[in-house]
Structure formats: C-alpha cells, structure tokens
C-alpha cells in the first residue's frame, strides 16, 4: 500500500514536471513569436517613416523651388516696370526742358514789353505833371485822402447797419428763448401768508389750549415765538408769525397736543421739541424732493438740508424754494435752446438763493453767504460764479451765469409773484429780533403781535432781575434810535430759573 502510494506520488510528480516544462516551452515559443512579430512591425514602421520623411523633403523642395520661381518672376516684373518708369521720366524730362526754354524766351519778351510800357508811362506822367502842375506824390496824396474819406464813411454806415441788424436779431432770439422757457415752466403759486390755521374738534378745546390763567398759551408762545390768536372764529386757532419755520413748529406741536388731549406746560415743551425733530426730517425730505424734480445729483447733504429750509423762507411774499425751482427750470430751458451746459445752469439756478437759508442766522447779504456756502461744500467754479453774479454785483462772465440772472429776474418780475409790503413787514420783525439778540446774555427773542411786542428770553446765570430791567430799557432805547415804526413796541424780558432734582 505504501509502495503503491509512493509510486503514484512519484508518477504524479513526473507528470506535473513534464506538463510544467511543456508550458514553459510553449510560453517561450510564444514569446519568441511575439518578439519576432514586433521586430517585423518595427522594421515596417521604420521603413514607412523613412518613406514619409523622403516624401516630405521632396514636397518641401518642390515648394521652395516654386516660391523661388515666383519671386524671380516678380523681380522680373518689377525690373520691367522700373525700366518703363525710367523711360517715361526721361521723356517727361525732355518735355520739361523744352517748356523751360520756351518760358525763358517768353519771359524775355515780357520783360522787353514791360520796359517799353514803363518808358511810355514815365513819358505820360511827365506830360501830366507838366499839364496839371502837381507832382506824382502830391496827386497820390490827394487821391488817397479822397478814397480814405469815402471808405471811412461807407465803413461807418456798414458797421451801424450790421450793429442794428445784430441787435434786432439778438433781441428777437432772446424773446423767443425766454418765451419758450416760460411756456415750458408753468409754475403754480400762491403768495405765502404769515398765518396758519389749526382746526379744532370743538370750541371747548380753546379753553384747554389757553389753560388755567393762560399758562398753556403762554408756554406755547414762549417756546415757539408764535402768536396764538384765539377769537370768535369757530373751531379754529390762528398762528401768526413772520418766521415760517417757527410757525410750522407751533402748528405741528399744537396739532399733536390736540390729538393727544393732554395739554399742560410740560407736555407742550415735549411736543414742541418733537415737532422740531419732525420738521428737521421734513426739511431734508423737501430738499431731496427739490433736487429730484430738477434732476440734480451729487449735492452735499448740508446743501440739500439748506434747500429744504428755503421752503420755509419767503422773499417779498414769494416762497424761496418754489422761486429757486422756477429759476432752475427757466435757466435749464434757456440753456438747452442756446446749446450750453444745461446741468450747470439748473444747478446754479437751484442754488442761487441758498444764502437765504442762513441769512437770518448769519450776518451778511444772501449773495455773499451763498457764495461762501457753495465754496465750503465744493461746488464748481461755474456754479459759484453764477451765484455771485445773479444780482449784478459781479459782471457775468459765462453764459450760464447770465441765464441764471435772467431767470431770477423773470421769476421775480412775474405779476403776483412778490409783495413789497409783506417783505417790509417781515424785515421790520427781523430787525427787532436782531436788535434784541445783539445784547449779551440774551438766549433768544421773538417778535410777536405783528411787531408790537418783543419777548426776550435771557440766560438766568448771566442776567439777574436788576440787570433784566436795565436790559429792557437798553433795548427800548436802541429800537427808538434805529427804527421807524407806528405806535409803540412792548419789550418783555423773561428770566426763568429752573431747579430740577429726582427722588430715588
């Protein structure tokens, strides 16, 4: 059994060895075949590459030869053209030489003719001098003088005619441009008044506004500087003040108090302060709306705010913001007709009265104040010059400045636009407040009762009771010396001391 197992194992081993050797031999034979085929393929590809390279060299040689032939042909054509040009130039040169010779002969003939003519002319001049008794120079002077006088007369007449025609045409064109601008600027306008009316829900509200012993109405008048007129007008209170900003603050505060229902001095003070903040926001919105209407962008925010303040400023009864918008539209329309810078004309027209937004706070003419503001907020030199020249204080040096000046005059001269008496009244009230504010220790002052009373709030830490009496007397004396007014003016100096503490 064991022997059979050993014999079987030896036989299996021999068979496996034989099969392995057969596989190895087969693999070696296959490898040799593959190598042989690879060599044959490489040799074939090598021959193909050599043939392709030879073909490419042959093709390139043919291409070079073809280009060389073309260049030789081109050079031959150029040589033929050059030869033709040389022949043409030679023929032209010969022709020119013949013409030069002919011209030379003609010049000699002309020169001989000139000499003969000059000789004849000299003989004629000598004969004329002998007959007239005048030398050539004297005759020339007489002739030149006569011609000069005639030319001067004709020139003067021509200049006069041209000037008249130019003036007539300029006036006609100016009328057309102004008419066009006015037609395209239809401004609705109502003259500003110095009173505002606040409607009441009922007449009982009048008593609450007046308050116990008049403390509410007195507090409201003191805080706003506005006259409250409570009369027989049903369900209405009239606010009177020459300053539209103060009047608007009082109107907003009073309407809020009426809506709230709680009316007492502390609440009045709170509502007045709230109305001031609300009006500041409204002023900025008005300025932004004005720039949007005109189509002007890039204005400094402070200039936008000052534009909004112009809505609450009047000039001879004309609202200054509406007037500025009107001037901007008119100047822009005329600039478009003349073909100059429309944006500069509009911008200058909108800002030309910007100084009026601060002229009641800062001393000086509104033109100078406007120029300073425009320089401060970096407006262009063209706009600054137009502001400076719009009242004729400075000669306009640009077309835009002249257009702003014309538009300002058109807007102001429009029938019904301004009222002289109202402006004089407002200036008188402003002068009263200016006199009061000029004294040291004065915090603020209000001209009320149509200028018949001035209320002055003083700083209690600087003005005591005795000084308040003397201050009233000094202000009265200054008013009497510097102003003319009908009737009498009541001067009231108010000194208020508050002590505030908090229980904790």
Curated annotation (Swiss-Prot):
EC number of the protein: 3.1.-.-
Database matches in PROSITE patterns: HD, KH_TYPE_1
GO MF annotation list: RNA binding; RNA endonuclease activity
GO biological process: mRNA catabolic process
Gene Ontology CC: plasma membrane
InterPro entries: HD/PDEase_dom, HD_domain, HDIG_dom, KH_dom, KH_dom_type_1, KH_dom_type_1_sf, Ribonuclease_Y, RNase_Y_N
Domain named KH: residues: 194-279
Stretches assigned to the HD domain: 320-413
Purpose: Endoribonuclease that initiates mRNA decay.
NCBIfam families: HDIG (TIGR00277), RNase_Y (TIGR03319)
Family, as annotated: Belongs to the RNase Y family.
Name of protein: Ribonuclease Y
């Amino acid at each position: 059994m064991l022997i059979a197992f050993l014999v079987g194992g030896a036989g299996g081993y021999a068979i496996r060895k034989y099969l392995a050797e057969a596989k190895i031999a087969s693999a070696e034979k296959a490898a040799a075949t593959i190598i042989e085929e690879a060599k044959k393929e490489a040799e074939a590809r090598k021959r193909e590459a050599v043939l392709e390279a030879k073909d490419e060299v042959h093709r390139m040689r043919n291409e070079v030869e073809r280009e060389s032939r073309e260049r030789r042909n081109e050079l031959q054509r150029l040589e033929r053209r050059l030869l033709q040009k040389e022949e043409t130039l030679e023929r032209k040169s010969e022709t020119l030489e013949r013409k030069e010779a002919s011209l030379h002969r003609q010049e000699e003939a002309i020169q001989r003719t000139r000499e003969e003519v000059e000789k004849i002319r000299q003989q004629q001049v000598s004969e004329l001098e002998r007959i007239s008794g005048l030398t050539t120079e004297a005759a020339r002077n007489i002739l030149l003088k006569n011609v000069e006088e005639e030319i001067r007369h004709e020139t003067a007449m021509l200049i006069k005619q041209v000037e008249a025609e130019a003036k007539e045409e300029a006036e006609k064109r100016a009328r057309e441009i102004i008419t066009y601008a006015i037609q395209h600027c239809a401004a609705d306008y109502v003259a500003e008044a110095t009173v505002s009316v606040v409607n009441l829900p009922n007449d009982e509200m009048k008593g609450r506004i007046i308050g116990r012993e008049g403390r509410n109405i007195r507090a409201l008048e003191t805080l706003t500087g506005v006259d409250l007129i409570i009369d027989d007008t049903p369900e209405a209170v009239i606010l009177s003040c020459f300053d539209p900003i103060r009047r608007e603050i009082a109107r907003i505060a009073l309407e809020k108090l009426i809506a709230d229902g709680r009316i007492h001095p502390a609440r009045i003070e709170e509502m007045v302060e709230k109305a001031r903040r609300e009006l500041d926001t409204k002023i900025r919105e008005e300025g932004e709306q004005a720039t949007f209407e005109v189509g002007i962008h890039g204005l400094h925010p402070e200039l936008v705010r000052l534009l909004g303040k112009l809505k609450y400023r009047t000039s001879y009864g004309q609202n200054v913001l509406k007037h500025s918008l009107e001037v901007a539209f008119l100047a822009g329309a005329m600039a478009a007709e003349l073909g100059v810078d429309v944006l500069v004309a509009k911008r200058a027209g909108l800002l030309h009265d910007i100084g009026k937004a601060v002229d009641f706070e800062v001393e000086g003419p509104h033109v100078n104040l406007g120029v300073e503001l425009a320089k401060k907020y970096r407006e262009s030199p063209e706009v600054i010059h137009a502001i400076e020249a719009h009242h004729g204080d400075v000669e306009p040096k640009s077309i835009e400045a002249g257009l702003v000046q014309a538009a300002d005059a058109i807007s102001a001269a429009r029938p019904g636009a301004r009222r002289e008496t109202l402006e004089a009244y407002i200036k008188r009230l402003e002068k009263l407040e200016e006199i009061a504010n000029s004294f040291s220790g004065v915090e603020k002052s209000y001209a009320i009762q149509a200028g018949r009373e001035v209320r002055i709030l003083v700083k209690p830490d600087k003005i005591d009771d005795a000084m308040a009496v003397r201050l009233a007397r000094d202000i009265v004396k200054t008013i009497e010396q510097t102003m003319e007014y009908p009737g009498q003016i009541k001067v009231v100096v108010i000194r208020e001391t508050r002590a505030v503490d908090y229980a904790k």
